[in-house]
Amino acid sequence: MSALNSFNMYKSALILGSLLATAGAQQIGTYTAETHPSLSWSTCKSGGSCTTNSGAITLDANWRWVHGVNTSTNCYTGNTWNTAICDTDASCAQDCALDGADYSGTYGITTSGNSLRLNFVTGSNVGSRTYLMADNTHYQIFDLLNQEFTFTVDVSNLPCGLNGALYFVTMDADGGVSKYPNNKAGAQYGVGYCDSQCPRDLKFIAGQANVEGWTPSTNNSNTGIGNHGSCCAELDIWEANSISEALTPHPCDTPGLTVCTADDCGGTYSSNRYAGTCDPDGCDFNPYRLGVTDFYGSGKTVDTTKPFTVVTQFVTDDGTSSGSLSEIRRYYVQNGVVIPQPSSKISGISGNVINSDFCAAELSAFGETASFTNHGGLKNMGSALEAGMVLVMSLWDDYSVNMLWLDSTYPANETGTPGAARGSCPTTSGNPKTVESQSGSSYVVFSDIKVGPFNSTFSGGTSTGGSTTTTASGTTSTKASTTSTSSTSTGTGVAAHWGQCGGQGWTGPTTCASGTTCTVVNPYYSQCL
């Protein structure tokens, strides 16, 4: 995204809980038992057979009540630390405890089978951030290279200014317990968050508190920033409401969690956005921003008044899980029909997949800073996927720029500038106070999470001018995709090994390199195998 685009700015600064439930901690409290709501998800094999996994979710530590060890006195109230209990990073980590959560009563978080619902406003709590668990003390780790990740989402109750997000970050599986002696709570209590903005609003980072240098927010009564930030790679599979959506990878120099200090963090909280070790902007695919304004929304090709399924594929250069990430592909399934990601209509940007050519073209067409490339691009994003990533599901509003980066014109005074139009919401929309008071009953539902080889996690038909052709789930383990104009040829009009050689609407090479054959994978995609 552009240097001015703060689309991820306050993902890590969601409105944080009630006055008593607004912080993270390192020790474990005993006032409320921590019981993780169950959430099942599936692992699929080629051919379409899937196995159900018994998972659960936990609430991020920043939303929880933090109090003194063996006392109910708050360590943190509103947006201010209680320095009578802790006045240094070390003392807070040792003397403050993180307590269990009343998921439905306090936070409006409920699960049923494979479905998770996040309510926006519940009492005095606003928004939430949750993680998928492998067991009671570990986050579920996903390695998605040469795999597809699928989920169903209902965004029908997300108006302008809200973001129901599903994404991955390279957090420690145990939440840092094994690395930091003061961290007793760990993943069980939602400790260890990091992302590509290097958030400094976290109360605890890497076994220490973030109290030293803490500055309360001037426009948010629950948040502030400290001296330290928590950096790691971030893959935004889904940032969306009922108006707009975006798919955005954010690499870092080092994929795993690293701690930064003050303005050296870069990202949202620093005077120099690009001073840090991570890419705060990303290489985004927002159909509306790419000129396809009739694709996503109420009554459009993907109709956001109804649930739909989102399929994302992580293609490698050699077609194996040990290869390097070369493309990210996306399509949708709604009403039994597979819907391809639309191709860009912006001059100078072609195709409908995220690859190096697309990112370079978007950078040039929109006049953006080369942050994505400078931090390793898809290669480093692939390193994060190889390292394993944690699944995050959240609902938030934006105290920075009112979510205009997602669903409106941003910057608001740049109407007509290439890349500024991101959605149809007015530039006056998204003010958090208004959204919270007028749209407090909003919610998002994520369900039917699946992971597996290409074409194993979904089924559907393809619309072909009034008739529908059925595509079975899992008919092959090679990559399925939408129509694409990505560069997978050898430069001589011949598609390279693993490259695309055909499919509905394909205008690229149809002849394969010597030793490979153009093989039909599905109506949208044929591949040189």
UniProtKB/Swiss-Prot annotation:
Domain CBM1 as annotated: residue spans: 493-529
Catalysed reaction equations from the record: Hydrolysis of (1->4)-beta-D-glucosidic linkages in cellulose and cellotetraose, releasing cellobiose from the non-reducing ends of the chains
UniProt-annotated glycosylation sites, renumbered to this chain: 70, 219, 413, 455
Feature: compositional bias, Polar residues: 425-438
A GO molecular-function annotation: cellulose binding
Signal peptide location: 1-25
Region spans: Disordered: 413-438, 460-491
Protein name per UniProt: 1,4-beta-D-glucan cellobiohydrolase xynA
Native species: Talaromyces funiculosus (Fruitlet core rot fungus)
